[in-house]
């Protein structure tokens, strides 16, 4: 081996870069082409943006098989008379029963 110039960065050393360019092929030879190819093709690791997968739309027939749930009625819960009448009851009780 020839001595390497210490002023060069490690990624610029002779022989550190492959002689051929990287390709989109996923064969065994191309997967082991260089470290970058091995990581992306061989191991399947990519740090770029993930592409959105389009969801498969279900066939139109499958929607008819789903059971439709009845919607709950919009009745107020709690006291059916409402808060206004309750206030009136409290006022009447205080008028009829003077404690002080």
Swiss-Prot record:
Known function: Transcriptional activator that increases RNA Pol II processivity, thereby increasing the level of full-length viral transcripts. Recognizes a hairpin structure at the 5'-LTR of the nascent viral mRNAs referred to as the transactivation responsive RNA element (TAR) and recruits the cyclin T1-CDK9 complex (P-TEFb complex) that will in turn hyperphosphorylate the RNA polymerase II to allow efficient elongation. The CDK9 component of P-TEFb and other Tat-activated kinases hyperphosphorylate the C-terminus of RNA Pol II that becomes stabilized and much more processive.
Assembly, per entry: Interacts with host CCNT1. Associates with the P-TEFb complex composed at least of Tat, P-TEFb (CDK9 and CCNT1), TAR RNA, RNA Pol II. Recruits the HATs CREBBP, TAF1/TFIID, EP300, PCAF and GCN5L2. Interacts with host KAT5/Tip60; this interaction targets the latter to degradation. Interacts with the host deacetylase SIRT1. Interacts with host capping enzyme RNGTT; this interaction stimulates RNGTT. Binds to host KDR, and to the host integrins ITGAV/ITGB3 and ITGA5/ITGB1. Interacts with host KPNB1/importin beta-1 without previous binding to KPNA1/importin alpha-1. Interacts with EIF2AK2.
Name used for this protein in its record: Protein Tat
Keyword Hydrolase applies: no
Comp. bias (Polar residues): 61-76
Residue segments, region Interaction with human CREBBP: 1-24
Subcellular location: Host nucleus, Host nucleolus; Host cytoplasm; Secreted
Motif range (Cell attachment site): 77-79
Region (Interaction with the host capping enzyme RNGTT): 49-85
Note: HIV-1 lineages are divided in three main groups, M (for Major), O (for Outlier), and N (for New, or Non-M, Non-O). The vast majority of strains found worldwide belong to the group M. Group O seems to be endemic to and largely confined to Cameroon and neighboring countries in West Central Africa, where these viruses represent a small minority of HIV-1 strains. The group N is represented by a limited number of isolates from Cameroonian persons. The group M is further subdivided in 9 clades or subtypes (A to D, F to H, J and K).
Protein modification: Asymmetrical arginine methylation by host PRMT6 seems to diminish the transactivation capacity of Tat and affects the interaction with host CCNT1.
Biased composition (Basic residues): 48-57
HAMAP family: HIV_TAT
Biased composition (Basic and acidic residues): 82-100
Domain comment as written in the entry: The cell attachment site mediates the interaction with ITGAV/ITGB3 and ITGA5/ITGB1 integrins, leading to vascular cell migration and invasion. This interaction also provides endothelial cells with the adhesion signal they require to grow in response to mitogens.
Keywords recorded for this protein, A-Z: Acetylation, Activator, AIDS, Apoptosis, Host cytoplasm, Host nucleus, Host-virus interaction, Inhibition of host innate immune response by virus, Inhibition of host interferon signaling pathway by virus, Interferon antiviral system evasion, Isopeptide bond, Metal-binding, Methylation, Modulation of host chromatin by virus, Modulation of host PP1 activity by virus, Phosphoprotein, RNA-binding, Secreted, Transcription, Transcription regulation, Ubl conjugation, Viral immunoevasion, Zinc
MF terms (GO), sorted A to Z: actinin binding; cyclin binding; metal ion binding; protein domain specific binding; protein serine/threonine phosphatase inhibitor activity; RNA-binding transcription regulator activity; trans-activation response element binding
InterPro entries according to UniProt: IV_Tat (IPR001831), Tat_dom_sf (IPR036963)
Site description Essential for Tat translocation through the endosomal membrane, residues in chain: 11
Binding of Zn(2+) 1, residues: 22, 33-34, 37
């Amino acid at each position: 081996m020839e001595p390497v110039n210490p002023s060069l960065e490690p990624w610029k050393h002779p022989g550190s870069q492959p002689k051929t360019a990287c390709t989109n092929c996923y064969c065994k030879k191309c997967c082991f082409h260089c470290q970058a190819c091995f990581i992306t093709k061989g191991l399947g690791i990519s740090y770029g943006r993930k592409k959105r997968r389009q969801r498969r739309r279900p066939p139109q027939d499958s929607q008819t098989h789903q059971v439709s749930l009845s919607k709950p009625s919009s009745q107020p819960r709690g006291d059916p008379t409402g808060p206004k009448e309750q206030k009136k009851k409290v006022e009447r009780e205080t008028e009829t029963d003077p404690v002080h």
